């Protein structure tokens, strides 16, 4: 199992429940220095109360903790890291970290997982690989004319630490999701000037108006893309943004009023097609991530459309490669459901070898 975030831990829990022994029948490798998956890298100001709803991992009730009752004022990265640490210890999942998987390749009928660890490089010969690497390690910044000539700072969501580093600066925030909105609200009053740009209009919805049908359609679109091997579409673009009191206050102040996307980047700012120019010391790219799949390149699983065809949790091209937390499974509740399904399929496959 490559990755010990929500998807990897969920699969590992069910593998153990189905009779496999952690550390001998299966191993979990994780690149992070500590527990928490991608959450351990989130910015300090992101609180449990303002983060996307985090569903409990399967069996978490056995250790007496729940994200539903966690202190909403605490940093999300700290709470998740703590709960996941307790989870790993309680279920004795024996996660090996920090271990970075460099490649997965074929050797006869076996799969070989090559890795780097603090003790040196090595390899594991295995029958099955569950890829649960998520997306955090593969940030996406779209190309615009002048991108590489910008004299200021390019900062992606993955690199953002706190508003303090932008004190008194002219900042452009790019993106239409909750991360972009969170940065804007945090930077308001700290940055000298804030400009929000997005590729598409932002739909703010009251709590009772949240479009569940659109959300279901967005997840279905992710599933269809995964099955066809296409690039995975955005979920947020199909579901809208909840209009909380904090967000409404930001709208009323004029902080959360997006402009259309600029057409080019210049050394000292950004320019729109109509000639309007905005000086910028930094551009924060809240433009999402792509699945982290580089280590699987030797297996030649990619389709010409750019993605990997995945159905019912496994690769169409190689049924020994499973994908947890991929496409429609990316949410915490989706990862839990998929974890059970993938674990059952893995055990069934192993029993036939």
Descriptions of predicted regions:
Residues 56-66, 225-230:
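Short, basic/glycine-rich phosphate-binding loops at helix/coil junctions
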């Amino acid at each position: 199992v490559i990755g010990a975030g929500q998807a990897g831990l969920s699969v590992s829990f069910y593998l153990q429940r189905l009779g496999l022994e952690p550390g001998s029948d299966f191993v979990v490798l994780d690149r992070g220095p500590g527990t928490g998956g991608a959450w351990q890298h989130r910015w300090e100001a992101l609180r449990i109360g303002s983060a996307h709803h985090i569903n409990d991992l399967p069996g978490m009730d056995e250790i007496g903790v729940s994200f539903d009752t966690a202190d909403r004022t605490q940093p999300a990265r700290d709470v998740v890291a703590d709960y996941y640490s307790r989870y790993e210890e309680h279920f004795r999942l024996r996660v090996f970290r920090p271990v970075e998987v460099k490649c997965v390749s074929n050797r006869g009928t076996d799969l070989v997982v090559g890795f780097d660890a603090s003790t040196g490089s090595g390899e594991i010969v295995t029958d099955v690989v569950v890829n649960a690497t998520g997306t955090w390690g593969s940030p996406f910044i779209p190309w615009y004319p002048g991108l590489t000539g910008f004299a200021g700072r390019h900062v992606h969501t993955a690199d953002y630490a706190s508003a303090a580093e932008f004190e008194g600066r002219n900042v452009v925030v790019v993106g239409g999701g909750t991360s972009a909105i969170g940065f804007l609200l945090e930077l308001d009053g700290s940055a000298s000037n804030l400009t929000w740009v997005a590729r598409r209009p932002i739909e703010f919805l009251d709590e009772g108006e949240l479009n569940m049908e659109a959300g279901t359609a967005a997840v279905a679109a992710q599933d269809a893309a995964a099955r066809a091997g296409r690039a995975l579409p955005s979920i947020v673009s199909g579901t809208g943004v909840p209009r909380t009191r904090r967000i409404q206050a930001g709208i009323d102040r004029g902080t959360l009023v997006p402009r259309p996307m600029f057409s080019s980047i210049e050394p000292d700012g950004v320019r729109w097609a109509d000639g309007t120019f905005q000086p910028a010391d930094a551009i924060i790219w809240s433009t999402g991530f792509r699945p982290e799949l580089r280590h699987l390149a030797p297996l030649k699983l990619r389709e010409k459309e750019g993605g990997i065809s995945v159905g019912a949790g496994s690769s169409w091209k190689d049924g020994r490669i499973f994908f947890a937390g991929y496409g429609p499974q990316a949410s915490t509740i989706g990862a839990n459901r998929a974890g059970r399904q993938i674990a059952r399929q893995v055990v069934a496959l192993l029993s036939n070898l």
